């Protein structure tokens, strides 16, 4: 079974599949950021990137929800690139070898899964792009290089965080 065939959480698994299929080790996550930005634009969302490469995706309030408070969802896009000793897996080029066995999702011991924070990014993208989600203003903030020193978060400027739709 593939991630995209799981019945639960519709878009979350589709986004997690995209994330797992796109190499994103620390310092190498800009391609993934570009793909998520493209998906957000396809959904009609406002997308901005700062000079470091962090993404901010804004979604307007759902109809009838303009009086609700805004929500910010934050996730980092990089993963810790660890693999089994002697493995030829290349985190800069290879998609993660995701396996589903029963109720477990893993990489068969070959590599880490990257669920920290890949699943957080997938959930945020699902919330941002799903028109059935009824909420006030929603912001997705996706930072880079968290695993090697919170570099993306440290590079955030107040101006990038202020404002909204």
Where are these regions (language model features)?
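Acidic/His- and Gly-rich active-site-bordering loop/insert found
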Residues: 2-102
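Short, well-ordered alpha-helix to beta-strand connector turns
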Residues: 44, 163-164
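Glycine-rich phosphate- or other oxyanion-binding loops that anchor nucleotides, phosphorylated ligands
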Residues: 149-152
């Amino acid at each position: 079974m593939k991630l995209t065939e799981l019945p639960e959480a519709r878009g979350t698994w589709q986004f997690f599949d995209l994330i797992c299929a796109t190499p994103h080790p620390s310092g190498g996550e800009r391609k993934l950021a570009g793909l998520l930005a493209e998906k957000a634009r396809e959904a009609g969302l406002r997308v901005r990137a700062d000079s470091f490469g962090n993404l901010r995706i804004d979604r307007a309030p759902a109809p009838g929800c303009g009086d609700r408070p805004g929500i910010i969802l934050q996730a980092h896009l990089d993963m810790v690139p660890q693999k089994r000793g002697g493995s030829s897996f290349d985190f800069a080029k290879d998609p993660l070898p995701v396996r589903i066995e029963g109720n477990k999702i893993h990489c068969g011991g070959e590599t880490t899964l990257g669920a920290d924070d890949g699943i957080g990014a997938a959930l945020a993208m699902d919330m941002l792009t799903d028109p059935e989600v009824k909420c006030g203003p929603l912001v997705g903030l996706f930072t880079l290089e968290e695993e090697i020193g919170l570099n993306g978060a440290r590079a955030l400027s107040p101006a990038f965080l202020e404002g909204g739709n």
